[in-house]
Amino acid sequence: MSAKTIAFFPEAAFGPALNSVGVAQAGEQRGRTAVVRTDEGMSGVDEGYGFSEHVVNMSEPMPPEEMAKYWTDFINGHIPNFDLSAYEQIDNYVKECWEAIVDTAIWAEKELPGVLETVSPDIVVVDR
């Protein structure tokens, strides 16, 4: 019987990526094969832990400096919203985060089907 393949799809951020590494390591200790779908900006993180990576662009490709500026501006622009109640954040921070999640899903649809066909996972784990 061959090992079950678990495909990890962490958000393109170190917290979710490293969380997936820990879960993937535990899976491999139990005889599973772990593979990771990663965004270009996180490429190399999972390989550094010995996992097979499959890059799927989650946004329009841009130089690292431009991507860093985008996220810095996004967070800095929302700092005042973090003083608001969760309810008051719905029309600003929550809405913009949701729109970003939808945009990443649209971008992922361009390459993700090919990765899923190549990997043929038995289980998919998503960390958003």
Language-model region placement:
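Glycosyltransferase specificity loop/lid
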Residues: M1-R128
